[in-house]
């Protein structure tokens, strides 16, 4: 009765609001961590984005977009991902062309390619991504160390920075914390934290970054 009264009181747009928040529940974008450098983002409307598929489980949800930061085998196993018809695969090849970092708008999801590089990763063959979904800005660094681009990220007002920190193939935890402070995202998540392992919580807890959000494999959070 109360819901019906609110619908009548608020009119058409009010009815849409009531149906969404009182009847259907509030839908939110989510992030599911698979392990190593792999994770999945789902928008509030059900659009699914896989990032650097390789590790763990949870590839059975049909994807709309698959992002590959570079062509190392622990980041590019796109065959693992279930796909919706018309699923778009964007790898470093499409994202970085002739020295130009491209931006894609796919049904309202914006994918901006940015720099990624270190001594183990050629800057011409690697990218990171800034993903905007439901107005939430998420930086997925790929395999990298500190880059020149990062000095501009604070102005982007990122909601999440997802950073690597294994200290072997990529920057270590100390440099990753330095990057987190430079980027100034509202929340920071460390992944790709130990070579050959899905995750290491003890190392993640030692990460001295502001607003450190720890996510373990097979854990999902609301963004």
Predicted segments with their positions:
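Short, Lys/Arg-enriched N-terminal segments with co-localized hydrophobic residues
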Residues: 4-27
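Core dinuclear metal-dependent hydrolase active-site scaffold
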Residues: 27-61, 65, 93-155, 171, ...
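Histidine-centered active-site/metal-ligand motif
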Residues: 36, 70-75, 118-121, 192
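P-loop/Walker A phosphate-binding loop and immediately adjacent motor/lid segment at beta-alpha junctions
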Residues: 36, 78-99, 182-194, 212
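Divalent metal-coordination and catalytic microenvironments
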Residues: 41, 70, 111, 143, ...
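Di-metal (Zn2+ and/or Mg2+/Mn2+) metal-binding site signature of metallo-dependent hydrolases
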Residues: 55-94
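Cap/insert and terminal regions of metallo-dependent hydrolase folds
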Residues: 147-223
């Amino acid at each position: 009765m109360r819901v019906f009264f609110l619908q009548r009181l608020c009119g058409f747009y009010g009815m849409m609001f009531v149906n969404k928040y009182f009847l259907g529940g509030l839908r939110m974008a989510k992030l599911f961590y698979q392990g190593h450098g792999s994770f999945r983002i789902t928008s509030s409307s059900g659009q699914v984005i896989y990032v650097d598929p390789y590790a763990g489980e949870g590839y059975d949800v049909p994807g709309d977009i698959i992002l590959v930061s570079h062509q190392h085998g622990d980041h590019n196993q796109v065959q693992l991902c279930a796909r919706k018809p018309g699923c778009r695969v964007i790898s470093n090849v499409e994202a970085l062309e002739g020295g130009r970092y491209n931006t894609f708008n796919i049904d309202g999801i914006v994918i901006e390619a940015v720099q990624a590089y270190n001594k183990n990763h050629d800057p011409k063959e690697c990218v990171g991504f800034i993903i905007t979904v439901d107005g939430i800005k998420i930086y997925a660094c790929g395999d990298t160390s500190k880059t020149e681009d990062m000095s501009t990220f604070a102005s982007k007002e990122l909601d999440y920075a997802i950073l690597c920190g294994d200290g072997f193939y990529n920057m270590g935890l100390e440099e990753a914390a330095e990057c987190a402070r430079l980027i100034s995202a509202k929340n920071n998540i460390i992944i790709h934290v130990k070579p050959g392992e899905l995750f290491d919580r003890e190392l993640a807890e030692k990460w001295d970054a502001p607003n450190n959000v720890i996510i373990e494999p097979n854990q999902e959070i609301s963004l």
